[in-house]
């Protein structure tokens, strides 16, 4: 995703899932916006974080939201996190010859109360993990996440780790910056979306 700078990540723990993404919208070396949304809430249990080309994000989200509502009406059951990830995977793969230029992280809580986290590449390959990162700053974010992630960490600790990983990416990746959106999806309780606004200043 070198053409459009962005970093997104996700962490799964026993108490829930954290999704986070930076606020900068850039293309090449030019900053187009410092207040861009890259995290989308599909329903009160599931969210998607994106890195990549910005027009593609909105189009994909509208399709996924509509399909998940329709499926829930037809079956009478709420969508699972894997339902969303698998549908998005199929959608991305169906455009493999003219691919969407995005990487996606799908996370949330299944109806049975189990946290789930998936990462998808532009062609729809899908992997389930405990922590993931995508975008131009993913290498730096992974380095910090591998150091701080531990089984049994709390949801609050996961949130702090996500923020620190994105701050590290902002320090090294010119396409990542200008604040962080953090979506917390707890096993018990309502999701919360928080914006942390700051700009990295040296000295």
From Swiss-Prot:
Residues forming the propeptide are: 1-6
Please write the reaction equations for the catalytic activity of this protein.
Cleavage of peptide bonds with very broad specificity
Q: Return one GO MF term.
A: threonine-type endopeptidase activity
Subcellular localization(s) per the UniProt record: Cytoplasm
Q: Quote the EC number.
A: 3.4.25.1
Q: Which residues constitute the catalytic centre?
A: 7 (nucleophile)
What GO biological process, any one, is recorded here?
A: proteasomal protein catabolic process
Using the record for this protein, list the coiled-coil segments as residue ranges, or answer none.
none
PROSITE patterns attached here?
PROTEASOME_BETA_1, PROTEASOME_BETA_2
Oligomeric form and interacting partners? The 20S proteasome core is composed of 14 alpha and 14 beta subunits that assemble into four stacked heptameric rings, resulting in a barrel-shaped structure. The two inner rings, each composed of seven catalytic beta subunits, are sandwiched by two outer rings, each composed of seven alpha subunits. The catalytic chamber with the active sites is on the inside of the barrel. Has a gated structure, the ends of the cylinder being occluded by the N-termini of the alpha-subunits. Is capped at one or both ends by the proteasome regulatory ATPase, PAN.
- What NCBIfam families does the annotation carry? arc_protsome_B
Instruction: State what this protein does.
Output: Component of the proteasome core, a large protease complex with broad specificity involved in protein degradation.
What is this protein called in UniProt?
A: Proteasome subunit beta 1
**Which species is this UniProt entry from?**
Aeropyrum pernix (strain ATCC 700893 / DSM 11879 / JCM 9820 / NBRC 100138 / K1)
């Amino acid at each position: 995703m070198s053409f459009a700078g962005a970093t997104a990540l996700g962490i799964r723990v026993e108490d829930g899932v954290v999704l986070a993404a930076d606020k900068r919208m850039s293309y090449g070396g030019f900053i187009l916006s410092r207040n861009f949304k890259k995290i989308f809430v599909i329903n009160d249990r599931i969210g998607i974080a994106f890195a990549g080309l910005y027009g593609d994000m909105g189009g994909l989200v509208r399709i996924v939201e509509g399909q998940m509502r329709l499926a829930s009406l037809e079956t009478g059951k709420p969508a699972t996190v894997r339902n969303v990830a698998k549908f998005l995977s199929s959608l991305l793969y169906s455009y493999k010859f003219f691919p969407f230029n995005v990487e996606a992280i799908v996370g949330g809580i299944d109806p049975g109360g189990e946290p789930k986290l998936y990462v998808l590449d532009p062609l729809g390959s899908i992997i389930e993990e405990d922590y993931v990162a995508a975008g131009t700053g993913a290498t730096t974010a992974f380095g910090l996440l591998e150091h701080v992630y531990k089984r049994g960490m709390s949801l609050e600790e996961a949130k702090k780790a996500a923020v620190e990983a994105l701050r590290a990416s902002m320090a090294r990746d010119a396409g990542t910056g200008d604040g962080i959106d953090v979506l917390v999806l707890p096993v018990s309780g309502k999701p919360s979306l928080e914006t942390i606004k700051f700009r990295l200043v040296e000295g």
